[in-house]
Amino acid sequence: MPKPKKGARFGGSASHQKAIFANLATALFEHGRITTTESKAKALRPYAEKLVTHAKAGTLAHRREVLKVIRNKDVVHTLFAEIGPFYADRDGGYTRIIKTVPRKGDNAPMAIIELVKEKTVTSEADRARRVKASQDAPAAAPAEENVVEAVEAEATDAEVENADAVVEAIEDETAADAPEAEEAKKD
């Protein structure tokens, strides 16, 4: 007979832990990002990602499964109408956890958990194009070096002196601006 895992629970009891995660998930889908303790954020991540996966399917049965957890119908509508279709091309990794400064008072490690808003679509065609480009790059590099050497050989002494004068003028301007910048910092 399977036995439940031993150990500490968030909130003390199983029902309280379930309520905590339901409330955290509701806030996450409502606001897009929330600040909570690091351990709660790490525990919330798989919980929230499973709900997003249900929303991606979009069936009535999946909606009812999500409604068992998230009681706010407006948030469920947002989840199924906006968030689920947004991640239709993405297989997992819908959330990110960013560690922040510890909380004042009890010094608990805090984190921000947020929904990832960037689209990352890497199809096989993109991957093949990158592989081909990386294979062609070593062959093209020697040709570019020859062009650079030819251009350097064609440069006349007058052009070199002109370039040196421009570089010196720029250095003089930056040297003149440096004391003014230091005075501005002191003020």
From Swiss-Prot:
Pfam families listed in its UniProt record: Ribosomal_L17
Gene Ontology annotations for the cellular component aspect, listed alphabetically: cytosolic large ribosomal subunit
Gene name as annotated: rplQ
Source organism per UniProt: Rhodococcus opacus (strain B4)
Keyword Ribosomal protein in annotation: yes
Assembly mode: Part of the 50S ribosomal subunit. Contacts protein L32.
Swiss-Prot/TrEMBL GO biological process terms: translation
Similarity comment text for this entry: Belongs to the bacterial ribosomal protein bL17 family.
Name listed for the protein in its UniProt record: Large ribosomal subunit protein bL17
Any one GO molecular-function label of the UniProt entry: structural constituent of ribosome
Keyword Acetylation: no
Alphabetically ordered keywords of this record: Ribonucleoprotein, Ribosomal protein
InterPro entries xref list: Ribosomal_bL17, Ribosomal_bL17_CS, Ribosomal_bL17_sf
